[in-house]
Structure formats: structure tokens, C-alpha cells
Amino acid sequence: FGMSTGLIYHPGAFADREELTELAKVVRSYGGIYTTHMRSEGKYLIEAIDEALYVAEKSGASVEISHMKCEVPANWGKAQNALRRIDRSRDRGNQIDFDQYPYRAYQCGLLEIFPTWAKENGVDRMIAVLRDKALRGKVIKDMSQSPCDWDNPMDGLEWDQVRLNGFNRESNL
């Protein structure tokens, strides 16, 4: 038994660490594990690791961090800091594990690379933003800035590396 979250994705992104902690307490009561796809793998990587460690500390649940990596250029050099934090949590008696996939790639929905302000009220709001010429221009400008002031998984990467790989309807192209 366990619980898995995708905190980079909507609607999981709306859960705060206190809610996660309370849910993880239930998981712990059944001897389960809490697996987290952390809130950030980009600009706020260390803070996202700290959030996972906080949940472990406060709930007593075993925690698995999915896809632990320092892939984006802004995070190069942060691995030792990340591992020290995990080791310190383990030294305090917390069960913390992590996994990592063996390739250099990233996959997400288009929603995840949009500025926070453009998606904060869900998909319907994002569609309305994209239909508005002025707001669409602001989205493009914000997505083109590097470094971003929001957690953009594309920050520091080149757009020619992006591959669109699936659509529900041809009209979405």
C-alpha cells in the first residue's frame, strides 16, 4: 500500500506540505510508502527535496523520491548538497530512498512549461489566455526568458530539443 504524488502536475501542484504530511500519516499507519514526483526538478530542486524530507520527518512514512536528478544546467553542481540533505534525514531515522532513470530526457504535458500565472486557474483559463492576443504574447515572452522567475522545466534548455509527441485531436496541431 502506498501513495504517489505528481506535484509538478495539476492538480497535484495545489497540495501543500501539510496536506501531504497528513496523507502520508495515513500511508504510514498501513505500513505503506509515500512516493513523490517532486514539486520541482528545476529552479526549486533543493526546496522540493526539503519538502519530501519534511513529509518523511513529520509523518514517519517511508519516502521515495522519483527521478532524483540535477539535469538542468542551473542545477549542475547541486547533487552533493541534495545527497547530504538526504543523508542527514536518514541519520535522524527517516527512511528515504530515490530512483533515477538512465537517460537524458524529460517528458511532461504542455501545461507544465507554461508560466504559473497563465495556468493557475486550470486548463480552461489557460485556453482563454492563449486565445487573447496580448496575453499570448506575454506567455511567449515569459517562456523565452532565461533564467525564469518561475519553475520552468525548459529553463536553460534549447527549444529545438522539444518534441511534440501526442495529440488527442488533429485540430490541436
Where are these regions (language model features)?
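Active-site neighborhoods of metal-dependent hydrolases
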Residues: F1-Y9, A13, L20, A24-K25, ...
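Extended hydrophobic/aromatic segments used for targeting, binding, or gating
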Residues: E18-A61
